[in-house]
Amino acid sequence: SFAPGSSRPVLRGQQGERVRVLVDGVGTADVSNTSVDHATTIEPITVERIEVLRGPAVLLYGSQAIGGAVNVIDKRIPTRMPDEAFHLDAFAGVDSATNLRTGAASLDVGIGSNLVFHVDGSWRKTGNAEIGGFQLSPELREELLEEAAEKQADGEPEEAAEFREAAGQRGFIPNSDMESWTLNAGLGLILGESTFGASLGWYDTNYGVIKRPGLKHEHSEEGGAEEEEEGEEIVRIGLKQFRADFKGDIYLGEGFFERLKLRTGYSDYTHTEFEGAEVGTTFDSKSVEARAELVQNTEGSLRGSSGIQYNHRDFFAVGAEAYVPPNLTEQLAVFTLQELGTGPIQIEAAARAEFTNVEAQTLGIERDYDTFSGALGLVYEGIEGVRFGINGSRAERAPSAEELFSDGPHIATQAFEIGDANLATERAWGLEAFARGSIGKGTFNLTAYRQWFDNYIFLEETGLEEDDLPVFEYLQQDADFWGVEAELRYPLVDTEGFRLLTDLNASYVEAELADGTAVPRIPPLSLLGALEAQTRSFDVRGEVQWFDGQDRVTSFETPTDSFTLVNALIAWRPLADNQNVTVQLAADNLFDVVGRRHASFTKDFVPLVGRNFRASIRLSF
């Protein structure tokens, strides 16, 4: 939702504080929720799988997941003995549009009959991203050319030339390069049906922050003087995180509770924003998250789990653009999820009570929030494996420290942001209906949903300026979200040794505030159609993805044009039925289209990457 070096997921039009990003059940413990230019500390090429959580089950992980959660599963803490003396996975890849060079490897080694040692590492480096046309949107180019004309008329030809140069920038996105590396080590103890493990990890990245061309703002120096900054100045972020994790899964026998699951994560996170060669603003966050969950043995048709969760975050920022004061957030929660099956009907219920304390020490402000969330789901198992379901929910979210206490220039959003220490809890009532299952040999999923928000928290432009930046305030107003999602995967040909599959996907969401204005950054309708041929040695896939334009915008947004992406991929398994070696060749955005995602804060000056050829090899032994 921001740029190549820093992006977060968008689920059903929700992002930021309303979508929780997890690593094996606990938070990533970075500060990506505080600003869209702050990266998540997850290296994609070391991920084993990704789960998108919605419905009653999401209440196990926090009221912040009011819009859903993304749970990233990796292998840093081993939970089973390898089948061989050691197991090695390796990956290497390159691409053309960003000059990507990347590699990763992980190794699991059995020690005796009960211990497993794991180590993994990765490295990734890119250059500036190439694009198929102008960097700036037509609206922003027109604005800069008008400013250039004004500067020329005022007798400032050098500044006019700078504006014209920025408006004419095309072919690549300056300062969009990045480099990152990770190193993780873990140890797992397997004792029958119980497992224990711990891991240590290091994440290090450096990436460019892409500023809006032509931006200027002033900030006060320590001595009280004001220094003017040009938006074209190169800004980079150097980010480091040390992380320690523990995981336990204890088998309790055949009583009421089958097992006890323990999970703890500790993070020491620092990132520094460099303005040229000078240190600008430093963000530091130390956090601990711990959870204990008791899983019930199935009693008849009843199963479930209950637990407790604790969250502690100590956040500190210092520098000219430390727009959030030092703050401490503590949360304690209890939760339960219960499932009851009666014949073809399954009932699922979840509840979560959460107690949050947010304190800004330097301001002398402390806020307490007690929130309760609940969800109820009903699923009917129809004929031939088709499932029909409906979920209802009521969720509450305490305001974040950033929403409460922000007060300063935030260059990532091109705004001077002002929080409100008197914000109330945000409440959402949700209703979701779905049908999913099989159609012959194919599968489908159709979902319709609606969410009614009370006290929805959002940024609103005030019409004022501070430090040459527009002033935005965090406000609250009721809001209404609704949308539909559809997926179909069907084999057109299914014979021994050859399959031809089709994929069809559609997604649409609409949202508006109680006063009838649009909620900002809502994605438009998107459609995807694909054909995929599969043989013993080859997979060949071609897809077309279309994004509608978005003209339902707020006063401070610009409309976004529609665009179409055409992609292709070939995967070759030289050992045929053996999956140990896979070579991939891919082409993304074949027609070099300039596309802009409306959900992005920076879509007017950070378009999608242009035509990109990728090659990779994956080994597993």
Question: Where do the model's predicted regions map?
Answer:
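Short acidic/polar hinge/loop motifs at secondary-structure boundaries
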Residues: 27-56
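Outer membrane beta-barrel strand-and-loop segments of large Gram-negative receptors
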Residues: 287-294, 333, 418-424, 430, ...
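Transmembrane beta-barrel wall of Gram-negative outer-membrane proteins
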Residues: 98-125, 136-207, 238-253, 257, ...
